[in-house]
């Protein structure tokens, strides 16, 4: 079980949003690279990064900040937000990114995801962001009619490294993970699932360490880490003991 600390980038700064609303951004660190190094020093082994501006623009906007992060940490980094073409994918992987996360393009052009998985095996994840049980795209600004499991099943056997499942209704508000929908997804597909959105407390961490959660590859934490609701050392200890 991997605990991924999150760095969400808006205008070059490390922020957290409430319910995916760009107008409800709290700045936590003006130096994302320093934050990345701090997470590494705390013992985390991965880093989850999202280019929020890029998610709306359809191309990387916070590239300078991402490059600084890659130079600041030795940890593997996965990046989502604005990655829509094979050229985008190749560009970031060539710069040292371990894994790209494809969200909107997974809905708009599933064939591109399949092609990317063949070209870059083990380095392509799919981000499924849901609101009210339906998949959202374009930086969560648009809702589709596609169900979460319906979309996920399109990529069975394609070589997708992981599915990062975000419940938008719980993101950034410390409401707790949507356990039912997350586990339903994990049970419906063979692709590893990473939970995102709502992780709120050490109680959630302890639940992640239970046998029923072994279907999950990990979980992403943002605001709970920044606000001190989750102690990094204790959380990592609990999850490693359950491995």
Swiss-Prot record:
What Gene3D superfamilies has UniProt attached to this entry? Aldolase class I
Kindly indicate whether the keyword Transcription regulation belongs to this entry: no
Q: Does the keyword Flavoprotein apply?
A: no
Q: What is its EC number?
A: 5.3.1.16
Active site (catalytic residues): 8, 129
The pathway that the record names for this protein is: Amino-acid biosynthesis; L-histidine biosynthesis; L-histidine from 5-phospho-alpha-D-ribose 1-diphosphate: step 4/9
Q: Which GO terms describe its cellular component?
A: cytoplasm
A molecular function annotated in GO for this UniProt entry is: 1-(5-phosphoribosyl)-5-[(5-phosphoribosylamino)methylideneamino]imidazole-4-carboxamide isomerase activity
Q: Catalysed reaction(s)?
A: 1-(5-phospho-beta-D-ribosyl)-5-[(5-phospho-beta-D-ribosylamino)methylideneamino]imidazole-4-carboxamide = 5-[(5-phospho-1-deoxy-D-ribulos-1-ylimino)methylamino]-1-(5-phospho-beta-D-ribosyl)imidazole-4-carboxamide
Report the enzyme's class at the first EC level. Answer: isomerase
User: Which keywords are on file for this protein?
Assistant: Amino-acid biosynthesis, Cytoplasm, Histidine biosynthesis, Isomerase
What domain of life? Bacteria
- What biological-process GO terms show up in the record? L-histidine biosynthetic process; L-tryptophan biosynthetic process
HAMAP family according to UniProt: HisA
Protein family (similarity comment): Belongs to the HisA/HisF family.
What is the designated name of this protein? 1-(5-phosphoribosyl)-5-[(5-phosphoribosylamino)methylideneamino] imidazole-4-carboxamide isomerase
What is the organism lineage in this UniProt record? Answer: Bacteria, Pseudomonadati, Pseudomonadota, Alphaproteobacteria, Hyphomicrobiales
Q: Gene encoding it? A: hisA
